[in-house]
Each structure stands twice: as structure tokens, then as C-alpha cells.
């Protein structure tokens, strides 16, 4: 499953050059990922209630075109890969038909002590049902 999360670029997200600061995209990816989980019926609060977290262990972004204050952008998000302990999400950030950025995050399932653990069947089943391995 793929979602598109709309975002209105705020002034605070821009830098001295008048474009969105590169770090703002990381915040947008997180917001889109959390929304993706909501939409598949697996809110992140439910994952945390089981004493688990999906820590970001790798992140990659390629910036194609700048976004500016006042732009309306959308973050396209999908789960690309799932293993027994890790997940990989893919993202594209759009302004209309213009691709602004594309990237990925990789996550490790951890318990409350920060130890790597297997993703429980109730979570892995929900995730697998919405896996989209091709872009």
C-alpha cells in the first residue's frame, strides 16, 4: 500500500537560502511513516504498547528540486521490504508532478531495553499484507 501525506511548507522549515532545509525532509518522512502505519490499522502507539520500537538504523535521501515556504508538497510512502527484524520504507516527495526528493529508511525492531528482537507475528502479518516491493 502507498499513501501520500500532504504537507504545507512552513517558514521555520526553510534556511537562509529560502529553500527547505535538508533536515526538514527527515521529519516529513517520519510523519508519513507514522501515518502509513495508522492507515494500515497499526498505530505506532500500539507498537509501543507492546514494548517495541522501530529504530531508524539507516537513512538515505537524494534531493532533486528545492521546496520553498508556502509550497504544498506530498510525501509518498510505502513499505518496500520486511525481514524478521528489519523494515525498509521508500519515499518520494512531490510538489505537483515535480519530484523533489526520494529516499529510504531502514528500521530495526527493538525491545524496551534497546535489544534487537524479531518482529512479533501480529505486527509482521499486518505489515506483510501491505508490502509493496516494487516502485
Task: Give short role names for the model-derived ranges.
Residues 1-5, 38, 68-72, 79-135:
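HotDog/MaoC-like acyl-thioester-processing domains
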Residues 47-54:
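Short, basic/aromatic beta-hairpin or loop at an interaction surface
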Residues 39-45:
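Short, surface-exposed acidic-centric catalytic microdomains
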Residues 1-38:
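Catalytic strand-loop segment that frames the active site of acyl-thioester-processing enzymes
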Residues 6-10, 62, 108:
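Generic structural detector for well-ordered beta-strands
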Residues 57-63, 75-76, 90:
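Short structured motifs
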Residues 11, 63-65, 81:
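A residue-level detector for short acidic-glycine micro-motifs
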Amino acid at each position: 500500500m502507498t499513501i501520500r501525506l500532504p504537507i504545507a511548507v512552513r517558514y521555520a522549515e526553510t534556511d537562509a537560502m529560502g529553500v527547505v532545509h535538508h533536515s526538514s525532509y527527515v521529519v516529513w518522512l517520519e510523519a508519513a511513516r507514522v501515518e502509513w502505519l495508522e492507515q494500515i490499522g497499526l498505530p505506532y502507539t500500539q507498537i509501543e504498547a507492546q514494548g517495541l520500537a522501530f529504530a531508524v538504523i539507516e537513512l538515505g535521501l537524494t534531493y532533486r528540486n528545492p521546496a520553498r515556504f508556502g509550497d504544498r508538497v506530498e510525501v509518498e510512502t510505502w513499505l518496500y521490504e520486511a525481514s524478521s527484524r528489519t523494515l525498509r520504507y521508500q519515499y518520494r516527495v512531490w510538489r505537483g508532478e515535480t519530484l523533489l526528493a526520494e529516499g529510504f529508511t531502514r528500521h530495526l525492531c527493538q525491545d524496551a531495553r534497546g535489544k534487537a528482537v524479531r518482529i512479533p507475528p501480529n505486527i509482521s502479518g499486518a505489515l506483510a499484507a501491505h508490502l509493496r516491493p516494487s516502485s
